[in-house]
Amino acid sequence: MTKQPKVRKPHPVLHGIGLVLSVILLVAVLVGTYVLSTMATIIDSFIGAPSGHYSDAEIADTKVKAEALAADVEAEGTVLVQNNDNTLPLAADNKKINVFGWASTAWLGGGSGSGGVSGVNTDLLAALTAYGVAYNTELTDMYKDFQDGREYIRTLSAWPEQSGRLYEPDINNQTYYTQSMLDNAKSFSDTAVVVIGRLAGESNDATKQQYKRIEKGGDIVVDDTRTMLELTTEEENLLNYVGANYAHVVVLINSTNVMELGQIETIPGIDACLIAGLSGSEGATAVPEVLWGDREPSGRTADTWAYDLTTAASYANAGLEGVGKYSAADGLYPADGTTNGNLDTPYTYEQVSYVDYAEGIYIGYKWYETADAEGYWDAESNEHGTGYDAVVQYPFGYGLSYTSFDWKVTDAAANGSALTKDGNVTVKVAVTNTGDRAGKDVVQLYYTAPYTAGEIEKSSVELGAFAKTKELAPGESEEVTLTVPVSDMASYDAYDANHNGFTGYELDAGDYIFTVRHDAHDVDDDANATITCSLPAGVQYAEDTATGNAVSNKFTGSDAIDGVSLDGSDSDQNITYLTRADFAGTFPKTNTPTRAMTDNVKALNFYTADEANGWINDADEAITTGAKNGLKIEDNGETTDLGFRLGSDFNDPQWDALLDQLTVDEMENLYINAYGGLAELKSVGKSKSKDADGPAQIGGFTGMGAGTGFPGSSTLAQTWNADLAQEEGRTIGTQALQNGYTGWYAPATNMHRSPFNGRNYEYYSEDSLLSGVICGNTVTGANQAGVYTYVKHFICNDGESGIYRDSVYTWMTEQTLRETYLRPFQMLVEDYDAVGLMSSYNRIGAVWTGGSEALLTGILRDEWGFDGAVITDYCDHHSYMNGDQALRAGGSLWMAGFTGGEMAFEAGSNSYLQALRRATKEALYMYLHVRVTNRDYADNIGDTTAVRHAFTTSVFGWRHLVALIDIVAVVLFALAVRGVVIDVKLRKAAKTEKKNF
């Protein structure tokens, strides 16, 4: 019997399902491949392996040194503001304490957002244990059980009322503070340390209400009578209790922001208070060392601490409530249906927003001291004092010490002299430690310029110079020198307010008074502490004193390059600006909640093709691309002689030959895909490089290769120590290289315009000079390490009003812009060799800062002579942050993020290509210039091992993996198709056989 062959049966359902699934898989894989291809440069930056020639031992050694430095910053940045009866330092044999306050179990190392730290490895409690202090765990366990950490620590993914929640059980609630617990605590120790904590951060300003949880798992209680920056009633009750029941009571302020602390003075039994700031990931180790006197708290306040924050001239126009809403703005950004990318869930923008800087130049001490000089506070009287003393608790620059100092002005030769246009005023002060403990002191020199009512606005005092001593042993002295360039005292007169026919920087004739002070208010009692100089005739500075370039109005009236006056005078903003001539009549009591948007402002809401075409200049010449000149700036990641040469001189003639080698594709890729690093440029030998965010911790924001978390920038500013700032910058730069980074999205030097700004912890101070010096030295240190910085945010990112911060219109006078907000950046460019800046999310007047020709070209390049690169902030809002606009306005790099992108408007004109070539040159100069600085620094210290460059090598062949997945998907699809085809053939064959049968 012949065996019949097995008949193959079709499986149409199975193969049909297989085909559908394979099609879905293939489409998904192909779409994924396309998306990944658009992000290739960014992916390379994030997953590339660092290559910087560092051994594991060197990396470990840097980490140890960085942690020690962080502790130094924390100690020197801690400000002793109260110390009744010399309660501090605590006795060496008093090593048992009670730690009160829920915030003691949620110690803040940083704020939230890009300036935060990725984790707090050493918090207060861990630091106490490491120091050998026993604390009452019954209390801290209760706090942890009440609320285990903050529910919302990331402000970028939370609302202000969530991230700003205040947790504290009431001391009178025996559900938490049982009688036995309180009795045990008093038996445990007669010393109480109370921790007060506050958290604000990126995207969330501090709230002007309190959102509290006072019951475990309970509902949120809203207190509309107190702001987040005041003590809660529960904290006040706690302080009253410990003040009445403990022999030694110390309050620690662990806050991102200035607070109202009047009760610290008035509640009986509160002995001492330390402003500890934010300690970073490790710096809290210094806190017990300060408490017990192993370290001296030599910090000074970097801001004014007022008893009532509503007395600030910026209050009405700050925070969420200070933001106004334009009417008649339907369809404009961001009220065009755009959702807020900062939150986990989409939220549609409800309004087109604005903020008025109606306070003008009068922020911080410049307001409080000038108001005092004008008698504005004379009628004030309360439990704290009368006049100024009833208003200001801790002046700018204030701080106590564990020891005492005596000052003697040793050189006041300038007294009685006539000032000269290009001269300096120098004062020398001998500082002697007259106490019985070692310590450091800070000497501050202020000036008072002549003022005429109704003319140029001027503060009654302004910081001109400062110096911090070394650590002085008892009886030891040091002479410090303070120098104020005469030109630094010039005011910017945008309106010819003094009627001399000149607009620009100028000095009025009259007496200039210099005072040696302990803070912005307290003049030293030395007989020579006040020095008077005269200026017989007014002086005008028509040119920038550093560059010699012409200076003129760029934002005012008909001179406004961007088309609308920054002060709002030609767009019906109708802003009343605070004037010293009439403080009472012009003090901003409320903001303007709504106003109509005029057509000239509407026209600049979006960037259009017509505007792009308007940049075309037919006279612009064609550029050369793809030339084979054989020039290389790097060889296998190492800088060539040509690279060093070009990095030394932006105007070197060899630049043209190098740039001629680049292709348009290379230049566009470098410009468009700048998030996370600078692209490889094969034609000139440039390797791909990585940049990282994190002003306090390199890579900390993304968690990719994080270095040591340093104390917040405001804590660093409280050190008043330029050398310490430079060492921090150099250390962060070194850790950047060790983690494969060559660029740093930091530091940040916006102003503490208001105590409610969510990112004040990330910025330095309310004062422009202190901000510029501390930030500038940080930049210098990073440059010395060979890492370029993108100092941010250029300009006026001084509020984080939640969903309204993106594209918010900011209005002010050009004097305010230049003297207050631009001044630190000008110092960085002209004095500290900064070669990278980052623009901001907001608008400066009517135009986005990253697309403002007046800002990026008119002032930055044409006046200050800046040759480096300007990168945009993260561009997740393309409808108003336009890469074409940024390039044409003077920007250099587009932080397109993971969305990639391409030029939306014309990209073929000679004008466009010239702009692209310029931007490429600026980015390459920035990249190379810090390598020159690094080499020169290594030569100066005689250590050639200090010359290190980071570049990125492939650690993971992700393109090959993607290709393999593509192949697998195609094969599976082919097999599925084959199965269906076979099924069709089998079914046809079966039908034929059946028919024949």
Regions found by a protein language model. Name each.
Residues M1-G501, Y505-D522, F555-F997:
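Glycoside hydrolase catalytic-domain context in secreted enzymes
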Residues V523-V551:
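Short beta-strand elements
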